[in-house]
């Protein structure tokens, strides 16, 4: 399956710090660095996880809100749905937002009832939750590059004959190409929904 890799390598969560890495190319250069290669090796050693294809782009995280935001000052007092990441909460609080930890399944009604005035997600995630029905504005903050990996149990991978391993690695690369194409198309599609 796919996963946000940094959840399992919390020492490297800085790669997901808001505004730290704000474009896809830089993120992929970091992900392909020796430092992160060591992390991927630690997954195999500690968790028995095999990264089949490297990171694939899921889109840029953006803020969507019920009101137009034109400057950082406009974040002051904005009630923003946030996940439980202490790093993300503190970053948005430092910018003036009031962060409200909510699960995604509560997002729509929380915006509808005024519990929150917006959220930050990849547009596809907000879109599939029907958020465009209750907010009008997309703020192109592009504050986090959203990337996931496709992985499997490393012991199982190692037990397979070499041709099967090669087929899985090839399929992983094909899945990345397809997933990135879909991710870019979805980002454009959902941008039009607001």
How does the language model describe each region?
Residues 1-27, 35-194:
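N-terminal secretory/targeting leader peptides
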């Amino acid at each position: 399956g796919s996963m946000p890799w940094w959840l399992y390598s919390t020492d490297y969560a800085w790669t997901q710090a808001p505004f730290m890495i704000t474009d896809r190319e830089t993120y992929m250069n970091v992900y392909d660095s020796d430092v992160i290669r060591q992390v991927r090796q630690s997954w195999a050693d500690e968790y028995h996880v095999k990264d089949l294809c490297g990171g694939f782009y899921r889109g840029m995280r953006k803020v969507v809100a019920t009101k137009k935001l034109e400057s950082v000052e406009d974040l002051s007092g904005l009630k923003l749905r946030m996940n439980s990441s202490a790093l993300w909460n503190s970053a948005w609080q430092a910018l003036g937002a009031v962060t409200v930890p909510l699960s995604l399944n509560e997002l729509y009604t929380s915006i509808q009832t005024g519990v929150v005035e917006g959220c930050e997600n990849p547009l596809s995630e907000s879109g599939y939750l029907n958020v465009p029905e209750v907010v009008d504005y997309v703020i192109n903050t592009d504050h986090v590059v959203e990337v996931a990996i496709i992985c499997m149990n490393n012991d199982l991978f190692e037990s397979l004959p070499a041709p099967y391993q090669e087929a899985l690695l090839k399929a992983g690369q094909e899945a990345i190409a397809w997933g990135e194409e879909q991710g870019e198309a979805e980002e454009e599609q959902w941008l039009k929904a607001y």
